[in-house]
Amino acid sequence: MNNLYIFHYHYIKGGVSTVVRNIVKSLKDAYKITLFGSKKMGIDGIEEVLSYENVDFIDFPELGYIYYDSTDYKTFLELKESIKNKLNNYHDERAIYWAHNYNLGKNPAFTEAFKEFITTKNIPTIIQIHDFPECARWENYSFIRKFINSSLYPIRKNIQYATINLSDYNRLIKCGIPSENAFYLPNAVEFAKNKDKIDDIDKDEVINKLKKLGYNVDPTNKNILYPTRTIRRKNILEAVLINRLYGKSNLLVTLPANSDKERPYEKVVKETFESEKVKGAWAISAKDPSLFPYILNISDLFFSSSVLEGFGMIYLESKFNEKNFLTRKLDVIEDFKNIKEISYYDRFLVSLSPKEINKVKEKYEEQINKIPISEENKNHLRQDLNNKFDKDLIDFSFLPVELQKKFCMEEEAKLNDLKEINKEIFDKIEMLTSTNHIDQGINLEDFSLKAYKSKIFLLLDKVQARGNAPKGVQGSTKEIEDTIIDENILKSFLTIDNIRLLFSY
């Protein structure tokens, strides 16, 4: 039985840990699997699979996050050397090495040590990309480029780049990674029906419970569920304003923030929900976690105004729970080839005065000047800024949070024109909340563990066949290490969408 070595900074509960659990479940009978990561950072996201017979965890403290301000070049080199020595201790030429988010800028010493290790040893390797630092994570980007000037994407026969969505798969190929070195591996999702029988739940009873908890909900309204944590990229104030303009629904948001960085945004969202003008309930599960299945049951629509997602979980959740959904149109929609047009909206427009537009543009100019990229690349962003702000109607998600809140608190008479401007959104909400579960083009089987397992074996066959091939055999891949790939990836993210003022609040 061959070894599979999996690397990530930590295994805290979250997206990457879910993926790792699914990898382990799919391969536990075919490989001896060892998970490497920082125990100190957390491993609660993988505890479930550590009981399997062929699965081990090895504490690798050096893989934990490091930080820009506390890492000088000497520290970087010492840490890199320590990581390389450990990797050499676990060198197995028959093993497959699988690293997650090695490019993210959370530990540049690991990034460079791992890259040098797999290229010099010619090890069959999967580098799975969940996120890019160039996508709204400029601190990470600056950190990784503080120490690494070479390409993060070496092209070798032994290296496969796996992405969790089709958009990023196409991005890699457009940016210069050969298709034979790229693999599309969408996440698997496992759902379990609630064991408690709740079909006969009385909607009025649930609404009364919410009222007793202090929420401003109307029992005659429809219920729009936004199942999310209160984090900036979820763009929750947009959902608040859309709900307010629709005027016939309660907006139900499930969770508060989960990190200190999100607390200022959480405070604004909390204050907005406390207004009498807003019908709904915020952070329900923090007040009473037992209510969630009942909230789910009485919901008439799943909704998301999120502006950044790596995976379309909400589409699968809504399908599983037999609920209709409406979301912002994001790149992850490409993963759902049959999704219906009624399922999403492109933008939510609000009217700004020329003075307000200039103020917002000034804030973006300040933002652009802070980003650690060339002046030429900054000019790409300035051009995009001018294009997106050349009319008096601006996408709500581009506004600073303070201005978003102001719109949410505005007198109703001043908001009426927004209903007509965004009529298509409200027509969709009306239809989706007035009909029972309709076919919106989502197939759960495409994202089942069974489908995932078959894709993983295709990926492993590919990396083993190409990695073990003699030079000059197995396709046309040349050994390339060219920063033009990195530059192209950077340019692919140079839009105002990725430096929204929302992200830096």
Swiss-Prot record:
SUPFAM superfamilies xref list: UDP-Glycosyltransferase/glycogen phosphorylase (SSF53756)
Coiled-coil portions: none
GO MF term list: glycosyltransferase activity
EC number: 2.4.1.270
Glycosyltransferase in keyword set: yes
pH dependence, entry free text: Optimum pH is 9.0 (at 60 degrees Celsius).
Activity regulation annotation text: Not strictly dependent on divalent cations, but the presence of Mn(2+), Ca(2+), Mg(2+) or Co(2+) stimulates activity.
Recorded catalytic activity of this chain's protein: (2R)-2-O-(alpha-D-glucopyranosyl)-3-phospho-glycerate + GDP-alpha-D-mannose = (2R)-2-O-[alpha-D-mannopyranosyl-(1->2)-alpha-D-glucopyranosyl]-3-phospho-glycerate + GDP + H(+)
Temperature and activity: Optimum temperature is 90 degrees Celsius.
Gene3D superfamilies linked to this entry: Glycogen Phosphorylase B
UniProt keyword annotation of Transcription regulation present: no
Source superkingdom: Bacteria
Keyword terms of this UniProt record: Glycosyltransferase, Transferase
Subunit description: Monomer in solution.
Function field: Involved in the biosynthesis of the compatible solute mannosylglucosylglycerate through a phosphorylating pathway. Catalyzes the conversion of glucosyl-3-phosphoglycerate (GPG) to mannosylglucosyl-3-phosphoglycerate (MGPG).
Protein name: Mannosylglucosyl-3-phosphoglycerate synthase
Gene: mggA
